[in-house]
Amino acid sequence: MLIKKEAIILRDLEAVFNIVNRVDFYKNFVPYCIESEILSEENEQMIAKLNLNIKGLSTSFTTKNLVKKYSSIDMQLIEGPFKYLDGKWEFKEIENTTIIFLTIDYKAKNKLVEYAIGKSLEKITTSLVHAFVKEANK
């Protein structure tokens, strides 16, 4: 299933990119995220893990993120409740305003996961983007 979101943030690209790229701070402002950590970071690659609680269901997933500074972050599932999950953040700056684009393509491992998480993922993704907008505007 493919989900696409975008938002305009009245902040410069560097500030917005740094907020999105600081996975270890997600637990402080991202809905449903109860723990977030960077497991490793080297050159343009980051391994990150998120623990989520969605409708009382706790789950976690780990991604390998290819970071192109101030341009994009490509995410690929390493471990989690999905058969696959690929995502991409893209950043575009226009006169000290940043447009963020988030694309997530995923398939749940089974019907229980699809029911519990999949049906909510569209709302979760919207909440996620709104959380980044709010955090950037602080």
Where are the model-predicted features located?
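A conserved amphipathic terminal alpha-helix motif
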Residues: 105-138
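Hydrophobic ligand-binding cavity/cleft-lining segments
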Residues: 1-43, 96-99
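Hydrophobic-ligand binding "helix-grip"
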Residues: 27-28, 53-99, 105-107
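Solvent-exposed, flexible loop/coil residues
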Residues: 13, 33, 42, 58, ...
